[in-house]
């Protein structure tokens, strides 16, 4: 089996690949992410995933490199990782009681081909109290997550409904990834 390299330092993406029994190594992409003039959130996440994977693939051309990126959107506003606690609180107040979209883009690169795809998931939050938001932000959990929450952690108590791929919200649409890897002659379902 060809070696897979995850171009990410995300502990969540690492855990998801391990959950799916996909053998991999980590080489963190040091690329400066740039968002150009894209027409849609799906274009943004696929472009960022491709930037990350391409940067690592330059020095690992004999392997399969996997890059991913996740953003949260609400009413055409992109909510990335908060820069501080105040911004995290603002994002959570914005999402309180509303439905937002989570986009995760994935890029898979080998010598032979490049595949990009994305998954879109709708997440609806309960109405959040100021105390709930303050307590959560104080935990520091939201500070390294797009949209300022981790659906797999303490932020799970905010979620009223989800339509789509839960694992995509965590950071990697693992079921779709397994299917896409078959194009690269990697079939983990028989591993």
Swiss-Prot record:
It is an enzyme of class 3 (hydrolase). The keyword Cytoplasm applies. The record marks 12, 70, 152 as: Important for substrate specificity. Its cofactor is a divalent metal cation. One of its GO terms (molecular function) is UTP diphosphatase activity. GO terms for cellular component: cytoplasm. Its main location: cytoplasm. The keyword Iron does not apply. Keywords: Cytoplasm, Hydrolase, Nucleotide metabolism. It holds the Pfam family Maf. Signal peptide: none annotated. It is found in: Cytoplasm. SUPFAM superfamilies: ITPase-like. Its EC number is 3.6.1.9. The active site is at residue 69. GO terms for biological process: nucleotide metabolic process. It catalyses: dTTP + H2O = dTMP + diphosphate + H(+); UTP + H2O = UMP + diphosphate + H(+). InterPro entries: ITPase-like_fam, Maf-like. Nucleoside triphosphate pyrophosphatase that hydrolyzes dTTP and UTP. May have a dual role in cell division arrest and in preventing the incorporation of modified nucleotides into cellular nucleic acids. HAMAP family: Maf. Belongs to the Maf family. YhdE subfamily. NCBIfam families: maf. This is dTTP/UTP pyrophosphatase. It comes from Bacillus cereus (strain G9842). The gene is maf.
């Amino acid at each position: 089996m060809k070696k897979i390299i995850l171009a990410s330092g995300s502990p969540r993406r690492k855990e998801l690949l391990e959950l799916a029994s996909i053998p991999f190594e980590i080489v963190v992409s040091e690329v400066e992410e740039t968002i150009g003039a894209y027409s849609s959130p799906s274009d943004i996440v696929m472009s960022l995933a491709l930037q990350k994977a391409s940067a690592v693939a330059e020095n690992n051309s004999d392997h399969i490199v996997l890059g991913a990126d996740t953003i949260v959107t609400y009413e055409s506003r992109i909510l990335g990782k908060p820069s501080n606690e105040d911004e995290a609180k603002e994002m959570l107040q914005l999402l309180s009681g509303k439905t937002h979209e989570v986009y995760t883009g994935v890029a898979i690169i080998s010598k032979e081909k490049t595949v990009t795809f994305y998954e879109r998931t709708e997440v609806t939050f309960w109405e959040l109290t100021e105390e709930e938001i303050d307590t959560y932000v104080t935990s520091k959990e939201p500070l390294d997550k797009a949209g300022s929450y981790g659906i797999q952690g303490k932020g799970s108590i905010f979620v009223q409904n989800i339509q789509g791929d839960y694992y995509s919200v965590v950071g990697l649409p693992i079921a779709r990834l397994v299917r896409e890897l078959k194009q690269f002659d990697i079939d983990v379902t028989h591993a």
